């Protein structure tokens, strides 16, 4: 079936951001057409939630395509114009099971040339792990916190550090964890004031929120 591609090429001019492509629910044919359309405008392709079958197809088509399997993301083309800023973003994750979402956020920021660092496996079940990294994390200007299960990490970080905090509930856990809904509700009802909360597993959205913040304060 043919379909009209209405890609938002003006988004970069309006917002300084590009439109990412959601790979999960698109066919290989749709992705190929979208990539061709985007690249014809000398724009960068950034695909989220893409599996290895679709990624390998695009890797065969484009020499400069890169598949980041752990992040389930694929890029084609040169990096975007670098964001001229000395501001830094820390991405903090509760456990290694949160890694895909953490790396999605990190890759999105790195594509824009943002200086960022991931702090992996510092969840509240072993609070000493977070405390041992706290001095280093405090050197960053914006914090993204990714956590599944009960999602308490965002509240703890929000009670210890003053930076803008973007919380990402992760669909890790079983039973009452409800694919991230418990973490989402926990973050939304946090007693640490001023925490911004993204949708479940939205690492890319968290990265774009962080990008808006550092652009506005640079």
List each language-model region with its residue ranges.
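Glycine-rich oxoanion-binding loops at beta->alpha junctions
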Residues: 73-75, 115-136, 181-182, 198
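Glycine-rich phosphate/diphosphate-binding loop of Rossmann-like nucleotide-binding domains
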Residues: 84-126
């Amino acid at each position: 079936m043919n379909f009209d591609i209405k890609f938002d090429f003006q988004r970069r001019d309006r917002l300084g951001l590009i439109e990412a492509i959601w790979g999960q629910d698109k066919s290989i044919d749709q992705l190929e057409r979208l990539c061709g359309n985007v690249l014809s405008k000398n724009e960068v392709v950034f695909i989220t939630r893409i599996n290895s079958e679709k990624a390998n197809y695009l890797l065969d088509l484009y020499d400069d395509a890169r598949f980041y399997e752990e992040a389930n993301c694929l890029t084609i083309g040169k990096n975007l114009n670098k964001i001229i800023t000395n501001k830094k973003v820390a991405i903090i994750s509760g456990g290694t099971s949160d890694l895909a979402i953490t790396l999605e956020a990190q890759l999105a920021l790195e594509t824009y040339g943002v200086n960022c660092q991931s702090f992996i496996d510092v969840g509240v079940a072993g609070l000493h792990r977070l405390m041992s990294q706290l001095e280093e994390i405090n050197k960053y200007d914006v914090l993204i916190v990714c956590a599944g299960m009960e999602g308490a990490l965002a509240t703890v970080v929000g009670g210890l550090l003053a930076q803008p905090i973007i919380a990402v509930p992760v669909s890790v856990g079983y039973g009452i964890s409800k694919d991230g809904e418990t973490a989402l509700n926990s973050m939304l009802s946090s007693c640490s004031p001023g925490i911004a909360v993204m949708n479940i597993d939205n690492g890319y959205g968290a990265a774009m929120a962080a990008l808006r913040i550092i652009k506005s304060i640079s």
